Structures are given as C-alpha cells and as structure tokens.
Amino acid sequence: MLTPRTRVLTALNHQEPDRVPLALWGSWYGVTDRLYFAALAELGWEPVPPFRPELLHSVNYYDDRLLAHLGVDVRHVDPGSIGVTSRVGPDGADGYGLRYSTSGLYRSASYHPLAEAGVDEIMAFPLPRAEEVIAAEPILARIAQIRALGDEYAIVGRAVASYGLFEMAQSLRRHDQLLMDLALEPEIVHALVGRLAECYGALLDRFLDIAGDALDLIELPGDDFAGNNGPIISPKMYDTYFKAPYTALIRRIKARAPHVKVIYHSDGAIAPFLSRFIDIGADVVHPLEPLPATDMAALKAEFGGRISFMGGIDIRKTMQGSEAGIVAEVKERIGQLAAGGGYILAPANHLQADVPPRNLFRLYTAARELGTYPLATGT
C-alpha cells in the first residue's frame, strides 16, 4: 500500500496509484463549524482549538483526527495571512479596507473602499504587507506537527488570501462597478488587478520562503469566473485582464518551488476556461462542480492529460440526501474522472451545516471502497 503522499503525487503525475486519493478541509472544500461539532458529537470527541481564533469564517477548525478517521491523504499548512487580514480595526475595516455585514452564518463585504477611486487612488491604496501578516513560527510548527502524525501525507499550502484577483477586485471596487469597469474602464481594472497581483505575489514569496521545501501543493487564491449555467465574464475578458497576472503568479511559485503543484479554484460551469487554466500553468483545478452544463467525462477526455481534477462531489443535494445517493455519486465520479490518475476526490465546496455527519462518514468510506485501482468494470 502506498503512503498518502505517494498516492497523491502518483495521481497528479497522471498515473494510477493504489486508490483514488482523497482531500478535505482546504480553502474551499472544508467542514463548516456546525458540521464539525456534529461529527465530533457522533464520535464522542472534544473539539481542538480553532486555527482561526477570530472565528470570523464559517470554517474555523481543522482536526487531523477527523481527517485520519476519514482516510484523507492530504494535510494543510495555513500561512496565517487570512486570519490576520480578517481582523477588524478600530475603523471597522479588515486588512484590505473592507467592512462586512453578517447574515445568518455568513458575512459579506458591505463597504467597498475603492468603489469611486481613480487610478491614482488605486495605486496609493494600502494593501497587506507580507512580513506583517505571515509569521514563520506557526508555519514551521504546523509542518513539524504534520510530520509527527505517523503517516507521510501530501502537504498542501492553503491560499494566502480568501479571494482571487477577480473576486477581491469586485470586493474592493463593488461587484457591479467592477463588472462595468471590465467593459468601460480598462485602465482601472489593470491598475487594481496589478496591485493585487503584486500583493499576492509577495505573500506567496514569503510563504514559500518559509514552507516551500515542505509543500507538495499550494492553493492559489481562487476566482469564480462562471456561474451554474456558464461564464460570468467572457473568456476574452479573462484573457485581457487575468491571464497574464495569473501566469506571472504561477511562474513566481515555480521559480521558488519548482516541485510544488498549483491548485486553482474556480467554481461554476468552467469548461470555456479550462484550456486557459492550463495555459497559465495550473496543475490542478478545483472543484469541477457537478452541474447540468458540465460534462465530466468529456472534460476528462479533452483535458485530463494536461491538468488534474480535484472535487466533483455535489454539496447542494447529494450530501444532504441518502447514503445510497452518496455511494452512487462517488461511483459515477470515479468512473468519469479517475481512469489513468489525475483525480483527487473531494467536496465541490465547503460541507455545510445541513449535511448529516453520517453522510460525511459515508462519503469517505465509499470513496475508499470504490476507488481502488484497477477500477472495477462499470465504475
């Protein structure tokens, strides 16, 4: 039997390991706090301290015990930058100048500091400084903790920011304004995206300088360029504004840590963008959501030799449904995506509070049972 790390790396090299590797609890495929507590109640365990003590997100805990119980092959290292920049200052703003409103379990930006800014204001706007938001000591302590767990896991660096270039630009500028800017004010978009790319590049540099030798994968701050039925912006606009900055960020990662695989997150019906994600240098794309507009088997056939897929498990209906439905989805997804390697099974997004703990457990037992190579005929 392969070690978890070898299992993951074999799959990402487009070869078949002993079974399909499994992931959970990354930046976009985590266990929300309420589900975490419910799962612990089922197991009779006490919670661990939160890795985000500010408790400002829906996912604030990370429990290696639960990952071991589920048979997950990856472990994550948090750069700390999201937690630090989420802290609210005396003016009510976070590290990016955003202010938030809370609705139910979630919060969203309600004050957008650059909504009316011109290019000069954008260029002068203060953004987080890497040395102030990423500290070496907790990162190195976490790496040592993972190495002491007893199994050799694939180590994933979590994203250095909650939002990618597109989504953070929307938050700072305001969603509707940024979308209009894409069509009418190209110099504003180029200035803002350029500033963010330089900020993120500095964050990635510092994280990799501390942890790069230990990491096997790293999550790039993700962007949703598509909705459930198709693109939010045109592929041409992606090429105009985002392709070059993301290419530069990935080259920056590879220059510091050539061995590290880059995970790129983009929700929705992303088929029109997949070739572009390959062009920018992404090694893995998450989440490949199961949507009517997404033909999983066709995407595997067309792109599976050039990029790996992570995710694929529906979190909107399947995970709230029957255990039989979960088993059926796992079987279908493995059949569509796992042949020849290049697939890591994971939720398509964070598992929410309405997921019964038994369904979380069943997802991963089914994946271990059905994901053994060589794949069964008809899987």
Where on the chain are the PLM-derived regions?
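A composition/biophysics-driven feature that prefers long, compositionally simple stretches
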Residues: 73, 80-81, 89-92, 101-116
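Short, charge-rich binding segments
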Residues: 65-69, 84-93, 145-149
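Short, glycine/charge-rich beta-strand/loop segments that flank catalytic centers
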Residues: 77-89, 159-162
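Active-site loop segments of alpha/beta catalytic cores
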Residues: 1-39, 45-49, 93, 99-108, ...
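Segments that shape or occlude catalytic/ligand-binding pockets
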Residues: 33-80
